[in-house]
Amino acid sequence: MRRLAAELDTGAASLYVYFKDTDSLYSAVLDELLGSLSLVRGRKPWRERLVSLLTAYVDLLTAYPPLAKTALFTRPSGPSSVGLWEAMLALLSEGAIVGRDAAWAGDLLLQRATATAAEEGERRLGTNTVAADEQVTEVIEGLSPKRYPHLASLSNEMMSGTPTTRLIWSFEVFLNGITATRNKP
């Protein structure tokens, strides 16, 4: 709060008139940022629109790593957050995912999206991310096939794919599981 107050050329106490703590400030900023999301409408299939919405959410948060981390630990409840949830639930409803299944599916999908954004955001801030990736690749490729037969046989696949490709694949996996288990106790 002090750092922001200094940038705004005001005292930290003046910010507390509007926000009870840093978390509430970040939550408000996050909600404002979410307002810039385009809530996907159109004629494309519901799954495609849902994956597009979630991917746009990840892209938005990834551009602001501190807010992505904030989104992991806060439950924003501002109008833009509520609008995001409403859009998600409407899309799930189009896929006949309703009630508890929709509520839990939305939570699961947003958890995945938010965690991915926080991780990717941190990677973008990091100075040695390429070196770290190379180190992990080197370790995996150097594994003994006798001791680690599964990892060794999949060494090329373990680090394959772009972050976006892997993210979309994960959403599809979740949606396949969600649709397969809907309406079950």
Give the ranges of each region predicted by the language model.
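Residues in soluble alpha-helical coiled-coils and helical-bundle/repeat scaffolds
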Residues: K20-S24, T62, P76, I97-R100
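Short amphipathic alpha-helical interaction/hinge segments
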Residues: L37, P65, K69, A117-R124, ...
